[in-house]
Amino acid sequence: MEMASAFTLNVRLDNIAIITIDVPDEKMNTLKAEFASQVRAIIKQLRENKELRGVVFISAKPDNFIAGADINMIGNCKTAQEAEALARQGQQLMAEINALPIPVIAAIHGACLGGGLELALACHGRVCTDDPKTVLGLPEVQLGLLPGSGGTQRLPRLIGVSTALEMILTGKQLRAKQALKLGLVDDVVPHSILLEAAVELAKKDRPSSRPLPVRERILAGPLGRALLFKMVGKKTEHKTQGNYPATERILEVVETGLAQGTSSGYDAEARAFGELAMTPQSQALRSIFFASTDVKKDPGSDAPPAPLNSVGILGGGLMGGGIAYVTACKAGLPVRIKDINPQGINHALKYSWDQLEGKVRRRHLKASERDKQLALISGTTDYRGFAHRDLIIEAVFENLELKQQMVAEVEQNCAAHTIFASNTSSLPIGDIAAHAARPEQVIGLHFFSPVEKMPLVEIIPHAGTSAQTIATTVKLAKKQGKTPIVVRDKAGFYVNRILAPYINEAIRMLTEGERVEHIDAALVKFGFPVGPIQLLDEVGIDTGTKIIPVLEAAYGERFSAPANVVSSILNDDRKGRKNGRGFYLYGQKGRKSKKQVDPAIYPLIGAQGQGRLSAPQVAERCVMLMLNEAVRCVDEQVIRSVRDGDIGAVFGIGFPPFLGGPFRYIDSLGAGEVVAIMQRLATQYGSRFTPCERLVEMGARGESFWKTTATDLQ
């Protein structure tokens, strides 16, 4: 049976050809290799019709133009040559579109990303809608790749090399107004007149490319170009620490095209695409993409979720304010905040105001839309307005009696169906539900700070939580724009449990004489966004270390922190960035202020700060303990799968994405090699490095956690 076409040609009475893109049975349009013949057949018809005045590409999907190429095509390539051939096929198709003798216009509404933007770049003009759903970008770098269908060559010539490099190197997505300002699109119109605006543009002569800004013209010359690439290269190296080969290849390919012409540029682009597709970094990044897509489809349980019409929040502090923001402004649900203090409510409202006002200032949001979203949030010092809330999120202090009291109050003041979700980071959910009248409706919902930025949430059912409560909480998390993983109700849950030994080891190395900045730099070089000591300062030393005694009580001395170090630091009133002094000292300008290591920290903890270990040795000690604990979490079924374990570590603590998560990293090293490293470290530094039984068994049998495919487990 012949596959239904994703591209349909209709010629209007005014001799404008409309090519409608609608991939059958898919919510998103993605480009697949088999579509090439369909597009070529249409191009042939266009060339044969001498009456045609212009062509318009438009999508039939309600919220996307083309979301990119189908990534599975890359996974199917076994060699760099096969992936290179795929890129050349894409380049050739775009060249044929571009070579049409009549104006070709892309009418863009919704996501226009990757191969979708490359198709739009091959057109002679572009019109997009002013809808917030409309975004344009080349995100291939986030998969360890570069644009392979001409994007590295066409974009710099259209908008200038420095602006194009920023887009391609970061995967940054532009909204309609930004795209118009940069010259990426020729017009921005309301959705209702998109087709007519594109048709009018197609009836004119080919749109002439507008002149580049003076700065971009200077940077396009040999001298300006040399300076630009040197500067951008240094900045990129600092940011990636050399861990992402795609960024180096992007610079090389763009420069080749500008210096030697487009023919050489296209050659370099296809070759680099093929080689990058085979790198372990790209394979790991693609595995994270597939795993996160998979998690987003996971309902959490077999039961249908209950309706979600409104949410209540207990506590207007930093977490409560952040949760209110994502619930109202991302999920679009009415939120009522209860705090014993009116100032707490004001704080939470200001939190959302600050977030939304920032978007208005950056022109990402209209003031009217800001006001509409803010109107969803209200506050109270009692339980008025809570009677019919479907789900209550508790974000009060980490105190068991207080949380149990909150459960009792919610059961007394809310509906019989209301779910109680605790944002605890350390207390067992079973204990919080111990005196509940409806324990099946009590669950953990652990957000990470800052709530609006951190993509992960942990959902923690206790033994008595119902399947419907799990499904409803998962549904809410997804509405809030989060990636949820369901974890077992054991001390530390998953993320904090694997993070604690990593941070403990960093503190232990401090007491042995390693310097703060050396430890942090070693882990940043390894691939973490910040080092462990800085992370502790950012989270708050008091907050970050609160869980250590809980974990030590549950799992024994492998979780013990170096004696008296934490208490010495806290007794010296060091809480980290929030009070201006921790391991680092901070200026007065809030989060943007510069930090420097406080030399007084060394005598305070009885250390010299001399340092004897190399950066790889420092990283090895921290990371191996994290890997070992992650394997224990699989063994104890704290996480439901290694997929969730990899996603949890990458999205929850910034485990290096190019390594694919703890379990993919173990697979890449080999379980046997990880065991050998840990046994060596155990001999040198003590029994906390003893590899767990599961790891030893896997090493002996030569087993791995993942199969070779992107999402299947062994």
Swiss-Prot record:
Pathway: Lipid metabolism; fatty acid beta-oxidation. Its main location: cytoplasm. The record marks 118, 140 as: Important for catalytic activity. Keywords: Cytoplasm, Fatty acid metabolism, Isomerase, Lipid degradation, Lipid metabolism, Lyase, Multifunctional enzyme, NAD, Oxidoreductase. Residues 306-714 are annotated as: 3-hydroxyacyl-CoA dehydrogenase. Pfam families: 3HCDH, 3HCDH_N, ECH_1. One of its GO terms (biological process) is fatty acid beta-oxidation. InterPro entries: 3-OHacyl-CoA_DH_CS, 3-OHacyl-CoA_DH_NAD-bd, 3HC_DH_C, 6-PGluconate_DH-like_C_sf, ClpP/crotonase-like_dom_sf, Enoyl-CoA_hydra/iso, FA_oxidation_alpha_subunit, FadJ. Its EC number is 4.2.1.17, 5.1.2.3, 1.1.1.35. The keyword Oxidoreductase applies. It catalyses: a (3S)-3-hydroxyacyl-CoA = a (2E)-enoyl-CoA + H2O; a 4-saturated-(3S)-3-hydroxyacyl-CoA = a (3E)-enoyl-CoA + H2O; a (3S)-3-hydroxyacyl-CoA + NAD(+) = a 3-oxoacyl-CoA + NADH + H(+); (3S)-3-hydroxybutanoyl-CoA = (3R)-3-hydroxybutanoyl-CoA. GO terms for cellular component: cytoplasm. Gene3D superfamilies: 1.10.1040.50, 2-enoyl-CoA Hydratase, Chain A, domain 1, NAD(P)-binding Rossmann-like Domain. It comes from the Bacteria. In the N-terminal section; belongs to the enoyl-CoA hydratase/isomerase family. Heterotetramer of two alpha chains (FadJ) and two beta chains (FadI). This is Fatty acid oxidation complex subunit alpha. It comes from Shigella flexneri serotype 5b (strain 8401).
